[in-house]
Amino acid sequence: LEVFTDIDIPKEYFEDILKRQAVVNAGVTFTFRNEEDGKFTKTDYCYPNGILDYVNEIAGEQTLTMPQFWQAERKGRDREDKPEYKVRISAALCFSNRVSRLEYYHNSSWLEHGGAPEKAVKNAFVYAIDAYCKQAGKYTKGESKLTFQDVADCLVLVTNCFSTQTSYENQTKKAITNKFVQDAMTEFFRDRLHVYFIENKQEADRIADQVLVNKRSRESAEKARLNIKKKLTGSLDIANRVQKFVDCRTKDVSKREIYIVEGDSALGSVKLSRDAEFQGIMPVRGKILNCLKADY
């Protein structure tokens, strides 16, 4: 207590830890008892089907595809001089246009920063969905390849892996770096997605269509952002002046004048008769509203 003077840990921290442990340890009940104002409250966390129940909870009922549960075991090594070990891979996933979530667990620990499983998922999902879009003719002519962000925006995925050898990125243990785990998971997801798309063509079409909607909306938003940024930060020149505005030559603001005229026809007449040294002109569209006949 002399060193750690603040021991008031919020209950939400314990609730989050216990819930995550219940997710990755199917059928095991974790109980949280908390005393407040002399009274105990009790909360149980249990997912009989583990990560599959968790994905159902996150995605809800309105999903693009039915939740899937895939699992496999692989055996290999990270390098030739390293010992061989086993890895058990489990994954639950579905696609949704309402919610997205990606969570990776290894040996019952939440990998907040992902590492090898995250890299495997990115590689496999982009490869499989891009291949399906090309095969099904989903891309327009000359369209760029989709990115993982386009996939992630409609993907609910939870992976839960166990291995007898684990290499963590650092002491925080929030990411793993096992090359074999990454390669095994990449192959696992590529194969499962390939088979899934063949056996479930309607769902594959819905997935591809939603991913392409995400991609095209992202590209449109990025294009609009860059155009606005260019207009706001670019220097004033002939290319980005206000349309139809006729400027004057002097930079002395005390002498500059602006004439607002009605329509392009008036613009032509005033432009011929003005003093271009200090008089600018801005035409506006005329007769937009007849105020005498307006109903307000």
Regions found by a protein language model. Name each.
Residues L1-Y296:
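GHKL-family ATPase ATP-binding module
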